[in-house]
């Protein structure tokens, strides 16, 4: 195709006054052909014969002669198979539409083009020598470089000015991308200058040096020669440009006269575009070629060094040395660079020396030069200044600068630096943690980047000093084989190591400017397998074990393994994660337990999380608080607020072992659970199906076994597991709600179907596995779990518990209890008396309570959700049966119905366990733990109920804002206190719910009736209506009935479903602190799906229970209504009475919707009501209220 010069006059009218005669002459072209073919004599002969003036200067003739290239013979080019080529994109056409090579990318970044007007163009002319009062061209260029923040782009024919180069290195050290395009033929000048400065361009990760050639001129015989790039301009931030005939050379500053212009404004866009065009046409700087200027006769001939290595024959093979140097000018590579071997086999002389024998001697030399460089940057210098000179066979080798262009050399380097990739993860982590700029995470040059050897050796410079910018001074130790070197963590944390922008690259050239080119990648990746081997054992094994465990493991280990770092903290969890820390490498199972350097927990923004492959250490609840400050990499500040559910889920064995030391890991995992964990989702999927089926079976059994007294024992056994699982599910839901919309239809269907097919055996297995750990765990828990167990602070709840126990076991006692309640309502004294009586009743009938509680788990959940927290809040601190702690101090009027639906298992367990234990003693304990029981109850209920909102979230509504704050506190405490065994117990309680169903149903019915009577429709609507008197006495202690399952030896599950009823601030329910732990348990159990299942179960059970309650508890309900009516009016959250029939209809409709929608979302738990869609993220109370609204 004719060039513009050939067609310059095409179409022009000779008569046009602006007509320009064509300057193209065929004689010129023929003369060039004669010069190329017949040398200079043929050229002159042709000029004479054609009567053409000599149009070439002597320098041009010499340049053409030196750069002529002959076409490759067909024999030298391998035959390439050509397939069918699309006609539209044919590559064999004369002018192919698409190149077969990708254009290099501006991988370091480039400012976004501003489409807005940047301002009028301003042009300032600069001359050299400069006028006295005007800055020189060099000064202006250096000022622009210094002030650049986004990008620096240089296009230069010859670049040998060390001062400007030093400024560019400093800019690269500031993480300002620096792109340098050099003329291909003059690139060797630049390489020599860099070598003399002892800089390894490979180590400068923020600098890309490439070469560009001029236009290629093709002769008719196939020979060709290239021109040169004579552009000279400096572009900074795409806002300012200096352009002219000023080259970055000393002579241009001192002796040459030149002119340059400073452009600002719109005109800069043209330079921006031009640079990007040139960069796309550029080739990587091949130091091998550049270092040895070719003889004039064959500038690109074989002498060019292609003979030395195979990689050079394919220039792309060595594409660019990883942009020489990460050292800033001041920290140039070691003096190794100064001498270079031209021996073609120099790279093979010492394969092991491949890593470049850069030594501290070089550093010392450079130090001497530092005054000259005047970088002011600290250099990593080792006292071992002597280098093994004999090992440095070449300047290129010694520097690791990829001057060695052979791929073999590259492989050697990679092989010698396998350990670099091992440290890759930590380096990367460090990179993010540290503010400093790590030179390079590229495994190959980590040593240099991080100055590991220097750090560990006696370094002349303190390690805290950052390597100047990106410049790293290498020592011979740095270059030793990996086996010889041992990395210290400090090496990775070396300030030098933080400058690397591409933290993810494991390979030396990965971030190199020429990286994009396939040959470079091939070089790196061919050895990459070896490099990766170090990672494989830990990471791959961990991933593999995680997958297996996620699917196959029971709750013991499934929750922990392979979980990503916590993505976020729960709304109620005040976890303070250190944003700095990131976990990249797989952690050994024990790594997180005691390491306290920095919590390596990635902050929420960090999404590139790697799963932890170790089980978290579970601390004693007492220790958790203390240890939260000492969190290791596995624990975050969130330890206090919540114990990671995963840790709860993890095997109790770990808990035992880890309990002795302060275990930090627990809390960290809590934060895990707070966010939806895909891994958890996987494991929970399998479990959820089991839970569904188990819950169904439980419901069915509960309906059938209303009078099954013999089932009580079984229920008691299974209660801890079942309760814990239910609570965990509820809590799981609550957390998931904060992040996930809940689909009632899906849940209902999944619940019904899955519950029907639930494998009770699996749950029982989980129970068995967890019961023992729970028992053991209870012991380590120390007084706190005991308090939780004991703390069932709700005098009203106690009365209710008694009532429930009475309802479950003795109608006469229930009747008496109702009478007592009425008396209490009449007078505050009576209320107190009733509270005492209820405690006594609980003591008298612990077994009945246990049975009742156990059975009602699911039923109770539904019923109580209907009743809306009429039942006393029961926080199942421990799966071990606890005597219901009834607050004698709190007034019975404040009886807050436990949100059994929320803590179904906890309520039932606490009720069932309460009779076994001395209720009076427990109340005192329960009173101690929490100043504001309401919050605690709502907190637990929020944990459990938020996830299981379908049953009814009574608790949430009751809590006031102050209560909410307390909820968070209590939750954090409980979470931190919570142990994995507890979570397992909750799971096991789910499995055992069946045995509890028979009496639980009776109890639930009776209690629900009683609660309905007490709270009336208002109370029902108000799940939050903990106790009507509670509202009056909002600050009363929370009536939390927390079962101490200590009898069973299981860790108390501090799931206080009890609504927060603050009868008296004096009462401090400790349970609340552990209540949150149940939520953690749920999380650890990976019960997101399970939680949904439970919600569905609860809703179904609530329907059944309501129906049963309506049948069996009508008489009781009337009494309760009478007794509770005054309190209802007091309830802040009291609502207009809701017709139970309507609720039943609503529940039925929900079930039908669920049935219709068989598939439920594992990730979305959305509470939908007619008016609003409440994302359960903050307040459990709000969730409960919302649930109530939806039910109504």
UniProtKB/Swiss-Prot annotation:
Residues 523-538, 629-652, 790-810, 861-878, 1068-1082 have a biased composition (Polar residues). GO terms for cellular component: cytoplasm; cytoskeleton. Pfam families: SACK1. Residues 437-447, 737-759, 768-789, 820-834, 880-892, 914-925, 994-1005, 1107-1122 have a biased composition (Basic and acidic residues). One of its GO terms (molecular function) is keratin filament binding. Residues 435-542, 557-661, 695-720, 737-1082, 1094-1145 are annotated as: Disordered. InterPro entries: FAM83 (IPR050944), PLDc_FAM83H_N (IPR041996), SACK1 (IPR012461). The keyword Cytoplasm applies. Keywords: Cytoplasm, Cytoskeleton. GO terms for biological process: intermediate filament cytoskeleton organization; positive regulation of cell migration; protein localization to cytoskeleton; signal transduction. It is found in: Cytoplasm, Cytoskeleton. It comes from the Eukaryota. Residues 926-946 have a biased composition (Low complexity). May play a role in keratin cytoskeleton disassembly. Belongs to the FAM83 family. This is Protein FAM83H. The lineage of its organism: Eukaryota, Metazoa, Chordata, Craniata, Vertebrata.
């Amino acid at each position: 195709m004719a060039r513009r010069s050939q067609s310059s006059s095409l179409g022009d009218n000779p008569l046009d006054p602006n007509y320009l005669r064509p300057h193209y002459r065929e004689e010129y072209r023929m003369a060039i052909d004669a010069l190329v073919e017949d040398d200079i004599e043929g050229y002159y002969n042709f000029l004479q014969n054609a009567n053409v003036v000599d149009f070439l200067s002597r320098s041009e003739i010499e340049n053409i002669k030196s750069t002529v290239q002959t076409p490759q013979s067909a024999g030298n080019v391998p035959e390439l198979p050509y397939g069918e080529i699309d006609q539209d994109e044919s590559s064999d056409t004369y002018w192919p539409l698409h190149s077969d090579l990708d254009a290099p990318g501006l991988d370091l970044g480039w400012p976004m083009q501003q489409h807005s007007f940047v301002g009028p163009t301003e042009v300032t002319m600069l001359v050299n020598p400069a006028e006295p009062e005007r800055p020189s061209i060099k000064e202006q260029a250096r000022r622009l470089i210094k002030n650049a923040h986004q990008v620096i782009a240089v296009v230069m024919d010859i670049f040998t000015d060390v001062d400007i180069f030093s400024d560019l290195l400093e800019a690269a050290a500031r993480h300002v991308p620096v792109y340098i395009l050099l003329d291909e033929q003059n690139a060797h000048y630049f390489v020599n200058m860099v070598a003399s400065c002892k800089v390894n361009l490979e180590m400068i990760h923020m600098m890309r040096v490439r070469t560009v050639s001029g236009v290629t001129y093709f002769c008719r015989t196939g020979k060709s020669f290239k021109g040169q790039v004579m552009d000279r301009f400096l572009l900074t931030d795409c806002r300012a440009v200096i352009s002219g005939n000023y080259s970055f050379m000393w002579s241009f500053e001192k002796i040459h006269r030149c002119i340059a212009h400073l452009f600002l404004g719109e005109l800069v866009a043209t330079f921006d575009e031009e640079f990007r065009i040139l960069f796309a046409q550029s080739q990587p700087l091949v130091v091998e070629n550049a270092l040895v200027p070719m003889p004039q006769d064959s500038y690109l001939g074989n002498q060019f060094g292609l003979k030395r290595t195979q990689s050079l024959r394919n220039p792309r093979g060595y594409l660019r040395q990883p942009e020489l140097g990460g050292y800033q000018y001041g920290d140039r590579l070691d003096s190794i660079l100064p001498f270079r071997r031209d021996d073609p086999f120099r790279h093979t002389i010492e394969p092991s020396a491949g890593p470049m024998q850069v030594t501290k001697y070089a550093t010392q030399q450079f130090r001497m030069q530092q005054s000259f460089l005047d970088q002011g940057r600290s250099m990593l210098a080792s006292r071992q200044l002597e280098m093994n000179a004999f090992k440095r066979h070449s300047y290129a080798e010694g520097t690791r600068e990829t001057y060695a262009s052979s791929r073999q050399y590259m492989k050697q380097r990679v092989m010698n630096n396998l350990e670099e990739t091992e440290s890759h993860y930590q380096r990367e982590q460090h990179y993010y943690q540290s503010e400093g700029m790590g030179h390079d995470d590229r495994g190959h040059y980590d040593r240099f980047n991080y100055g590991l050897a220097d750090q560990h050796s006696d370094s002349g410079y303190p390690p805290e000093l950052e390597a100047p910018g990106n410049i790293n001074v290498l020592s011979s130790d740095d270059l030793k084989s990996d086996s010889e070197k041992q990395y210290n963590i400090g090496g990775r944390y070396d300030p030098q190591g933080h400058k690397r922008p591409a933290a993810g690259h494991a390979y030396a050239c990965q971030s190199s400017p020429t990286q994009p080119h396939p040959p470079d990648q091939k070089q790196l990746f061919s050895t990459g397998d070896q490099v990766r081997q170090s990672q494989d054992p830990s990471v791959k094994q961990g991933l593999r074990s995680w997958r297996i465990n996620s699917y196959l493991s029971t709750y013991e280990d499934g929750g922990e393994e392979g979980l990503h770092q916590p993505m976020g903290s729960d709304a109620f969890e005040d976890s303070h994660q250190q944003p700095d820390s990131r976990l990249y490498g797989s952690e050994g199972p024990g790594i997180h337990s005691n390491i306290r350097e920095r919590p390596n927990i990635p902050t929420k923004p960090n999404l590139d999380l790697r799963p932890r492959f170790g089980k978290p250490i579970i601390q004693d609840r007492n220790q958790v608080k203390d240890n939260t400050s000492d969190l290791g990499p596995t624990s975050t500040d969130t330890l206090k607020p919540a114990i990671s559910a995963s840790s709860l889920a993890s095997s109790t064995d770990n808990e035992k072992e880890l309990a002795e030391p302060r275990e930090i890991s627990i809390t960290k995992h809590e934060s895990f659970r707070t966010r939806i964990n895909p891994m958890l989702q996987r494991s929970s999927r399998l479990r959820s199906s089991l839970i569904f089926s188990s819950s169904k079976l439980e419901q069915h059994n509960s309906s059938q076994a209303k009078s099954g007294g013999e089932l009580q024992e079984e229920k008691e056994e299974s209660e801890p597991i079942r309760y814990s699982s239910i609570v965990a599910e509820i809590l799981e839901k609550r957390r998931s709600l904060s992040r996930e919309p809940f689909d009632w239809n899906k849940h209902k269907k999944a619940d019904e179907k899955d519950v029907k097919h639930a494998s009770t055996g699996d749950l029982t297995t989980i129970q068995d596995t967890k019961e023992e750990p729970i028992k053991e765990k209870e012991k380590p828990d120390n007084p706190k779990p005991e308090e939780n167990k004991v703390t069932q602070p709700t005098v009203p709840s106690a009365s209710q518990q008694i009532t429930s126990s009475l309802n479950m076991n003795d109608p006469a006692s229930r009747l008496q209890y109702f009478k007592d309640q009425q008396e209490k309502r009449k007078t505050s004294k009576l209320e107190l008396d009733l509270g005492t009586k209820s405690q006594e009743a609980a003591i008298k009938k612990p077994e009945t309570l246990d049975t009742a509680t156990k059975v009602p788990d699911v039923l109770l959940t539904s019923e109580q959700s209907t009743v809306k927290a009429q039942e006393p809040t029961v926080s199942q601190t421990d799966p071990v049966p606890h005597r219901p702690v009834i607050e004698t101090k709190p007034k019975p009027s404040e009886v807050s119905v436990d949100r059994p639906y929320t803590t179904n298992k906890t309520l039932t367990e606490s009720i069932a366990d309460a009779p076994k234990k001395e209720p009076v003693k427990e109340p005192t304990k329960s009173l101690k733990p929490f100043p504001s029981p309401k919050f605690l109850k709502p907190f637990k209920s929020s944990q459990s109920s938020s996830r299981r909102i379908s049953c009814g979230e009574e608790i949430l509504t009751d809590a006031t804002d102050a209560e909410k704050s307390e909820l968070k506190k209590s939750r954090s405490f409980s979470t931190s206190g919570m142990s994995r065994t507890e979570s397992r117990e909750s799971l096991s309680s789910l499995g055992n719910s069946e045995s509890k169903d028979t009496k639980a149903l009776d109890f639930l019915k009776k209690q629900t009736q009683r609660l309905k009577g007490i709270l009336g429709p208002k109370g029902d609507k108000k799940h939050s209506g903990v106790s009507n008197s509670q509202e009056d006495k909002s600050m009363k202690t929370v009536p939390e009935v927390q079962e101490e399952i200590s009898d069973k030896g299981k860790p108390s599950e501090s799931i206080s479903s009890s609504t927060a009823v603050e009868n008296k601030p004096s009462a401090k329910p400790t349970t609340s602190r552990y209540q949150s732990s149940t939520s953690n348990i749920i999380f650890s159990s990976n019960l997101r799906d399970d939680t949904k299942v439970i919600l569905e179960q609860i809703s179904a059970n609530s329907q059944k229970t309501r129906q049963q309650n309506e049948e069996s508890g009508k008489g009781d309900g009337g009494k309760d209504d009478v007794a509770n009516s005054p309190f209802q009016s007091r309830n802040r959250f009291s609502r207009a009475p809701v017709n139970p029939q309507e609720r039943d209809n609503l529940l039925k409709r929900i079930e039908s919707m669920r049935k219709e929608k068989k598939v439920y979302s594992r990730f979305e738990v959305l509470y939908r009501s007619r008016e609003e869609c409440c994302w359960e993220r903050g307040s459990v109370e709000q969730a409960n209220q919302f649930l109530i609204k939806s039910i109504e």
